[in-house]
Curated annotation (Swiss-Prot):
GO terms for cellular component: cytosol. Its main location: cytoplasm. It is an enzyme of class 5 (isomerase). Pathway: Carbohydrate degradation; 2-deoxy-D-ribose 1-phosphate degradation; D-glyceraldehyde 3-phosphate and acetaldehyde from 2-deoxy-alpha-D-ribose 1-phosphate: step 1/2. This is Phosphopentomutase 1. PANTHER family: PHOSPHOPENTOMUTASE. It comes from Streptococcus agalactiae serotype Ia (strain ATCC 27591 / A909 / CDC SS700). Mn(2+) 2 binds at D298, H303, H351. CDD domains: PPM. The gene is deoB1.
Length: 403
């Protein structure tokens, strides 16, 4: 019999808690990640007040130096620890796939200087359209259409850009490049990015409408992803007939594999929390697993190195955490974690190789304290242990520690 009827996993995208032991093997603008510390540096430089996460035990997580403005609790309401990544990457897909039990020994490719000319020219030759070279770099999805949408409307050129993750995105005005044509071009781009030196996790069609100065991305986005190379714990749950709910970009990250209820993309963290609470309230969701990604920390503030915005975003989540807890049932387990770091005080604009925090709370807990420091995949091993399914490639359950 399951210890918990439902487990809700919430990933605070990029909220790392200090450099991992191998952080110096990863770099940002030529600077090794060894001094990165997302939560620590935010707390130290701009202050961090997250009393609800602190109550569960955020300030109790072992660190070389305590979080400056997040005190340890004498008697926390839950359990806490930090987890180390073993996979050879620090991107979103690698982090999430490892959380669900995979060891990624061949990381996806990212393109901080834009895609190589041979990929761009292949897409041009296939599509019969030129590509705007100035857009070919990591770019905000809204900024790139503001900057190059007017030119696309005049010339019909393609807007191709990337991000910190292993993705190639093509933005196209629906009145200039019809959806079916955009999708066909994306399918071709997918076909030429399936192996090194350009092994990409996703190709994303990003259609938009409107006039210069008032462009709006539409709901006709389409992702061309790759599925995990082996079954994850999501697949094990699905195969056992256990409900799996995805909130935010989780469905995209796993290409729908192992997910039987996709609750849609988030417009913002707040919208994602609304969707999670709605999901938790579904009468038919009696037993199973929900998996939520809240990306604003990373997308809006980490990459932009905006410490104040990142702090405020953490405050907003913490203020809404009681609503999530109120939506829990007696035999629910809430797990709050991250997928990598993105220290807004650090060099460069890329993710940082860090430990991730783990907070565990249930109304049924009679104990509290620290869980031994482990690895990302311990989360999925615990989920598997609870529901009586097999683990994936890696991971050790800490279910026995939650009492």
């Amino acid at each position: 019999m399951s210890q918990f009827d439902r487990i809700h996993l919430v990933v605070l995208d990029s909220v790392g808690i200090g450099a991992a032991p191998d952080a110096n093997d990863f770099v940002n603008a030529g600077v090794p990640d060894g001094a990165s510390d997302t939560l620590g540096h935010i707390s130290k430089t701009v202050g961090l007040a997250v009393p609800n996460m602190a109550k569960i035990g955020l300030g109790n997580i072992p660190r070389p130096q305590a979080l400056k403005t997040v005190p340890a609790e004498e008697s926390p309401s839950g359990y806490a620890t930090k987890l180390q990544e073993v996979s050879l990457g620090k991107d979103t897909m690698t982090g999430h796939w490892e959380i669900m039990g995979l060891n990624i020994t061949e990381p996806f490719d990212t393109f901080w200087n834009g895609f190589p000319e041979d990929i761009i020219t292949k897409i041009e030759d296939f599509s019969g359209r030129k590509v705007i070279r100035e857009a070919n770099k990591p770019y905000s999805g809204t900024a790139v259409i503001d900057d190059f949408g007017p030119r696309q409307m005049e010339t019909g050129e393609l807007i191709i850009y990337t991000s910190a993750d292993p993705v190639l995105q093509i933005a196209a005005h629906e009145d200039i490049i019809p959806l079916e044509e955009l999708y066909r071009i994306c399918e071709y781009a997918r076909s030429i990015t399936m192996e090194r030196p350009a092994l990409l996790g996703r190709i994303i069609a990003r259609p938009y409408v409107g006039e210069p100065g008032n462009f709006t991305r539409t709901a006709n986005r389409h992702d061309y992803a790759v599925s995990p190379f082996e079954d994850t714990v999501l697949n094990k749950l699905d195969q056992a007939g256990i409900d799996t709910y995805a909130v935010g970009k989780i469905n995209d990250i796993f290409n729908g594999s192992g997910i039987n209820h996709d609750m849609g993309h988030n417009k913002s963290n707040s919208h994602g929390i609304d969707t999670l609470i709605k999901t938790m309230g579904l009468s038919e969701f009696e037993k199973g697993f929900s998996f939520t990604n809240l990306v604003d920390f990373d997308a809006l503030y980490g990459h932009r190195r905006d410490s104040h915005g990142y702090r405020d975003c953490l405050h907003e989540f913490d203020e809404r955490l009681p609503e999530i807890i109120s939506a829990m049932r007696d035999k629910d387990l809430l797990l709050i974690t991250a997928d990598h770091g993105n220290d807004p005080t650090y060099a460069g604009t890329d993710h940082t190789r860090e430990y991730i925090p783990l907070l565990a709370y249930s109304p049924s807990f009679t104990g509290n304290g620290l869980i031994p420091v482990g690895h990302f995949a311990d989360i999925s091993a615990t989920v598997a242990d609870n529901f009586g399914v097999d683990t994936a490639m890696i991971g050790e359950s800490f279910l026995q520690d939650l009492v």
